[in-house]
Amino acid sequence: MYQSPLIQDLHDRGLIAQITDAAALDKLLTEESVTLYCGFDPTADSLHLGHLVPVLILKRFQEAGHKPIALVGGATGMIGDPSFKATERKLNTPDVIASWVGKIRGQVEPFLKFDGANAAIMANNYDWFGGMNCLEFMRDIGKHFSVNAMIKKESVQQRLTREDQGISYTEFSYSLLQGYDFAELNKRYGCVLQIGGSDQWGNIVAGTDLTRRLHQKHVFGLTLPLITKADGTKFGKTESGAIWLDPKKTSPYAFYQFWLNTSDADVYKFMNFFTFLPVARIAEIEAADKASGTKPEAQRILAEEATRLVHGEVALMAARRITECLFSGQLADLTENDLEQLAQDGMPGVQLEKSNTGLIDALVASGLAKSKSEARTFIQSGSVAINGNKAEALDHAIGGDELLYGRFTILRRGKKNYGLISWQ
């Protein structure tokens, strides 16, 4: 049992992998408001689902009265963290990284409050590394790191023992940069806690050691467990790729559907990780689901809570509406924005010219039929619908009010096979 209700809650949720000095941190959190940080390197133009847990940890700490710092790695993003990566990262240009930094800041900011006694801070480590020269780095930072200790890190050893992949000095020096981030944030803002994924443990410990050496301060690290799925497949990925927090890369509808498809074996764990529902409430939901003997409610609750957190209430309502319309066949209730989400990533689709296209050709073009002969068979069997209305004429040409908002037509074969035509 922990004294700090926050640490106890994180423990109960299964969100703690390691803490550098658990007893001292637990005591400190019960005595005062602390400043903590988490770093986010711009490795793409959006954060993905794996970043959501640490973002929510910052939010949990702030709601408990502590002061969070979201550090965007404008400098470290130019290097690339080698931790447990099989190959060296591609180096992106400064202009690309600067663009990504701006986008990531915009994604993190809505989760935090930037006013009040424990107002959050957005920082960029390029602010202190950008003007530092090589001699300063080697003299003031490098002398505090033992190469012997660095080489022993598991993440480095994995690269050194691979015959086809070594590790460059650039990536090898990454932990020095991350370590100095902690020391600099301690000096500037009194930051005493760094959080990160379990793969960051070595870098975080390097930061606690460097801060002690440079500033004689006792600071802490807390790592979060690797998010795994019961079936062994990678979390946060679908057949079409990663689940992004940017709605332009993963629509709110696709985001919502991702959570709806969570397995029974994972759903309660993910409710603890990705929602602010009390642990006791999640246990009640699990007990009710198991007692009911029917379809669990947990997936719907998780999908609603997570979508609301990331995309807001309006986007959640749209995701629910799209889901219900496709289930009921009442496609007339879909808005133009709903159809744009489906065209983005919610449904297999095809772009066609507005030219009196026949239904048979449309079925083939959309992938709902392998050939014109098969398309005719589907139509004759009564299994084809246009915007939810059964289509029976073999010579039917799609047009008029079948072009929803003048832009879209939804074809259905059977009960579950959809194709969305975007008319050009």
Swiss-Prot record:
GO terms for biological process: tyrosyl-tRNA aminoacylation. L-tyrosine binds at residues 37, 174, 178. ATP binds at residue 237. Transmembrane segments: none annotated. Catalyzes the attachment of tyrosine to tRNA(Tyr) in a two-step reaction: tyrosine is first activated by ATP to form Tyr-AMP and then transferred to the acceptor end of tRNA(Tyr). Keywords: Aminoacyl-tRNA synthetase, ATP-binding, Cytoplasm, Ligase, Nucleotide-binding, Protein biosynthesis, RNA-binding. NCBIfam families: tyrS (TIGR00234). A motif ('KMSKS' region) lies at residues 234-238. Coiled coil: none annotated. InterPro entries: aa-tRNA-synth_I_CS, aa-tRNA-synth_Ic, Rossmann-like_a/b/a_fold, S4_RNA-bd, S4_RNA-bd_sf, SYY-like_C, Tyr-tRNA-ligase, Tyr-tRNA-ligase_bac-type. This is Tyrosine--tRNA ligase. PROSITE patterns: AA_TRNA_LIGASE_I, S4. It is found in: Cytoplasm. It is an enzyme of class 6 (ligase). The keyword DNA damage does not apply. Residues 357-414 form the S4 RNA-binding domain. It comes from the Bacteria. SUPFAM superfamilies: Alpha-L RNA-binding motif, Nucleotidylyl transferase. A motif ('HIGH' region) lies at residues 42-51. Belongs to the class-I aminoacyl-tRNA synthetase family. TyrS type 1 subfamily. Its EC number is 6.1.1.1. GO terms for cellular component: cytosol. Homodimer. The keyword Kinase does not apply. GO terms for molecular function: ATP binding; RNA binding; tyrosine-tRNA ligase activity.
